[in-house]
């Protein structure tokens, strides 16, 4: 991770109920590509994503964005869509919050429905979508605002192999088009397929970070043990 991205974490700590769940964390993201955050359950992956996005307060340290415009940051949660609304309404919602003109909203919704293959479902309830379709909708809804960086928390959790491959293809396409991706996953195969850079968290601390090559040449015993499966995920 060499070229600077306009997001730097310095001495960040997050404590909950008197317990440190994240920190100390010092991290500057690379300027482009996809950063994958890995680590066992409870290691702080989701908390780190939330801190980066600005929806988790830190107890100590600084989170410095070069650009503080929230429209430039997108987030896909593990339960991200509004189930009682239609597919089209889900897509339109972020743009309505930004008071985007109706004509532009309609064009953007049409574009993303076509891109994720859900044109026929535009007026159907989100509850009728499959798990993979819901996740594609969630990603499209985050991207419809054209963010510079997109944070994703386990975007393929509980999906079958076919749906996972579809989501990975969409994410690869999005990253190739210039959107910066920062993603937490427990799927090491997925991490290998998508990562340009890797962050390994353990007990709320970054134990190793670097280019994807560290998958094959880990510098720490902790990452080597995690990759072997000796640390339960």
Model-based region annotation:
Residues 103-121:
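Conserved ABC ATPase "signature" region
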Residues 150-153:
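Catalytic Walker B motif of ABC-type/P-loop ATPase nucleotide-binding domains
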Residues 125-129, 133:
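Conserved ABC ATPase signature
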Residues 161-163:
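Helix N-cap at the start of a conserved alpha-helix in ABC-type nucleotide-binding domains
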Residues 53:
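Helix-to-loop junction immediately C-terminal to a conserved catalytic motif
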